[in-house]
Structures are given as structure tokens and as C-alpha cells.
Amino acid sequence: GLDRFSIATDYYVQGLVALNRGDMSKAVAALDAMGAQEEVMSADREVMAPRLLHLALEGQIKLAAGHKEEALELIGRAEELEGSLPAEYGPAVPVQPMAELLADTHLALGNAQMAQHYYEFSLQRAVGRGRSLAGLRQLAH
């Protein structure tokens, strides 16, 4: 069978697709199916990714439901946990750096200064990452 990292990534993507379609119940179902509610501490990104993705999806669900502070708290917690991990080379694990997601969230909420801070922070760990660079370009206009 698939490992926890792959399962969590799949449910995360399913949850995001559901949110983008406005289907909150499917997004919540993906979050529930993902599991990973329990706190985990490891230096291994693939061990930590399910927890990070759970916090990220839960935060995005809260944001879609209009609970801005809870969304920032959950995604901020994911960013802190990811920030405690050693830097790695290669594709992002999980699929989106949590600092970038936090920047996207601040941008969506109209907080340009915090968005810029987290895009820049994301680029310190993922040099040249296109989505973070695009976020900074969007802020410049």
C-alpha cells in the first residue's frame, strides 16, 4: 500500500480541489480521511508532511468558512513546524512550503506586509521558487 506521506498528499490535493469548487463537505471529508491529527516531531520531512498538510488543509477550510484568525493560526503552526526541519534540496516536501501558503493566506486577507515577509522567508528555504516569486511580483504592482 501507499505510505502515509503519499496518502496525505493525495487527500490534501482532493481537499484543495473541493475547496476550489466550493464543495466544503468534500474538503472536510478529505481532511478527515487524511488523518494526521496527532502531533508528531521528526527531522524527516516525509514523516512530518502528513501533519503539515493536515494543518494546512484545515486552515484553508477555516479560511473558506470565514474564520480568518483560526486559519492563520493553523497555517502558522504548520509553518513553524516546517521551519524547525532541516533544509533539503529537491522538490518541496510537502508539495507547497508552508511559509508560501501562509504568505498566500496573508495576501488573500489583504495583509501585504506579512505576505511579503513570508514570501521572502519561503525563498530563503526554496531559492528561486516560482510561486513565491510570483507572489512578490504581485505585491509589487
Where do the protein language model's features map onto the residues?
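Residue signature of alpha-solenoid helical repeat architecture, marking inter-repeat boundaries
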Residues: 3-6, 45, 49-51, 89, ...
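"A position-specific structural signal for the A-helix of alpha-solenoid helical repeats
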Residues: 9, 13, 50-53, 57, ...
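Amphipathic alpha-helical segments of tetratricopeptide repeats
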Residues: 32-40, 76-87, 121-124
